[in-house]
């Protein structure tokens, strides 16, 4: 039997389903029943099918619901089938290795039997057992290690993180900090990442990496691993066609070239490696990017962007990175104690210190304010088991490896259980009240189903390249996405109707986008893929000019007004000149923070910062100053305004605001439940307001200081459907499939209804008396006419580009708007 799981076959199946559920088809059926009229009503009665005919629309909805399920199944089947070969390739070599070790054990045991008498050599057998069992354990550990390496980093797919953060599947402690940054069209930065479960040692010592240590490693079996900036490793296996297939990754693919390898993220970037696995070039789809050069021993020497920005790396005699310098001379210094990074001093003078335990892992992190921001305890597998914070709060982590559960005990004592599968993907989160969130994934670690704490499920589907193609919520509302061959978004459809369409040039730059009414925004790009001109649906246009480094130097808006921009060597805006020649200037510190803004009249607003980079004081243009103080957690403790009035803030164990004390000593207090939802508010005069919630976090009750309770109800996608006041008054709300409010029924039973166009814009309001007010829009989506029930109207007129020009009211009165240009008097 021929098995066809090509994309063409999948699309054919999807079209069959689409044809069955076509709105046109069902409209034809409905029209048919209406057209045949009374002549066949008797047949319906005799056949007892009148109810089915009357309910044809409801039946169509059932078919649509079934379509959602069928389409989801088709997407899932094809994704799963296409993943079979990939999954087989990804594990076969490791499983064969493990199996070979087991076979070797059997053969070795057989060799310990004396062929003459059948007796075993017990001493030899003991040695064989110890050696071969260790080999089997090592093979199994290699498989597990490969999976864990995929889950390193700040954003491991399918995993959740705690506050500091800790990976709630693997127990990995994650830390990151950006020490130096150069902005502009092609940003450069020195960004450090730490993974407690990363066993490798590099130029930053144990477990640390920086963002340009992306590298490629080829294994003996032909598998290629790509270590990303944050430490995560993605593996690519070579198939029979010689192509490298991502083991558990979406979108990216690896290509072998004569020079080495290229990692391609379609529509975004390309990373080139040499044969030794060193990253040589990182560039966008227009070829603009960063080049990397290395010392003879293979260590990174320089990262240089095409716009002239650069970072230079210097090492000590132990081959540890000790200095990073940008092209303007700003420097980051790194200090070590043995093989461990001890301190980092940034260009602004901020210092970050690290202390380690006997296991070589970070036990304390000291921030730039000389506050120990976290203290860590680990188990023997380098997993976090306890954390302590500056306010004395603690978090604990308990691991049930047999059942694949991690229990997090929060700072407020609440316990949340995270359940993971054999690939460390979070498949279930269990809360103290017994409610659960559930997750399903495809073979590329993409979530295909999420069920919330109320049992409501949202489903996602992806194409074979990993692009999201459909979401279906708990009320069967569908959003579909299509892409071109380079994974650029082509269209968005909601409930079967296309709402957005995009167009691209050969390089993948956006050249236009249009809505379902054909209103289009066109984009003209330069050779580097930068927008030069944007033309809107009304014919108005925006023009943009750039300097040689790719910075915007001139912007001509739709009204013809021109603003120009000046930059420093770090591509930071240092001045702007508006259409009236008013100049505003900006100054920065070594950490790229604005320290002063000087307006056209010479008035200055100044900012000062604490060592952690938070604003301490603002001296305004009028010379008056406002200030902030912070607690050890870095949260605002006091705010003093320009009049000297001070507001005080306190926080609970979960770092929620627990009280606010105003300058007049009026105090509001706040109490939260175990899910950090506000449940009690004490007002300055002593009154108390309480709140209740459902498992999804929707507010279901509010009781005011007088004891009056208002209740709220919601539908399956968390839209408010009913408000029940304390006096029994009831207000109900109804929505269409797009989520627009279409009907509001008040306590007296009076109905206000609403209609919308296909872009979700409200087109009419009909009051309880049946009088309708209508709204009409222009091609820019701005209201151009409001027609009232008595036939009168308000008319809005706009300039090109959408700026309001005039308003004419029903009584004939009007308003006109214009731009007043200021010209300096002649001397």
Report each predicted region and the residues it spans.
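Intrinsically disordered, low-complexity segments enriched in small residues
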Residues: 111-115, 119-196
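Short, solvent-exposed loop/turn elements at domain surfaces
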Residues: 198-200
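Extended charged/polar low-complexity repeat regions
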Residues: 168, 196, 206-210, 215-824
